Amino acid sequence: MIIDRIEEQERYYPLHPDMELAFAFLAEAPDLEPGRYELENGLFATVSEGDTRQMDTVSLEAHKKYIDLQYCIAGGERMSWAHIQELNATTDDPEHDNYFYTGTSTSVSIRPGMFYVMFPSDGHKAACHHEFQKHYRKVCLLYTSPSP
């Protein structure tokens, strides 16, 4: 898992061949309408806005085929993370590359200008809150994880 500010993006370009392409899309995202966007090399992104969900009502999820990069454009959210080896698997949806878990996780506040990257070993909850609901605008970008 990576959490950082968008200004630090260049340090992550060497991690994946499509990382620079992903960040280039994020530069355009604040002006885009909500919806799904198809990019080069099989990357796709969803620009969305809404209200955060109560943290304890959301399951942890992970993806086996994709790396998940999420960027907060406006508002804010809390996200939660745990390594999947420390979690209990509950439901698999391989058709949509979603795998759900329960267990203890660590949460952090995500503010505008911050991004986080979740790898296949990272269980996560996104767009959540503990006490007070917030409105957010964000981008979720998925790109293929290199084969192990």
Question: Each predicted region: which residue ranges?
Answer:
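Conserved short histidine dyad/triad with adjacent acidic residue
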Residues: 46-61, 78, 82-86
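Conserved metal-binding segment of the jelly-roll/cupin
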Residues: 110-123
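Non-DNA-binding regulatory cores of transcription-related proteins
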Residues: 91-103
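Short beta-strand His + acidic residue motifs that chelate non-heme Fe in jelly-roll/DSBH
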Residues: 79-80, 108, 124-131
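Conserved small/polar residues in nucleotide/adenosyl-binding loops
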Residues: 143-148
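Glycine- and acidic-residue-biased ligand/ion/polar-headgroup-sensing regions
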Residues: 67, 71-77, 94-97
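His/acidic/aromatic-lined binding-pocket segments of jelly-roll/cupin-type domains
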Residues: 67-71, 107-108, 115
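Surface/interface-facing alpha-helical segments and adjacent flexible terminal/loop regions used
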Residues: 1-34, 38-39
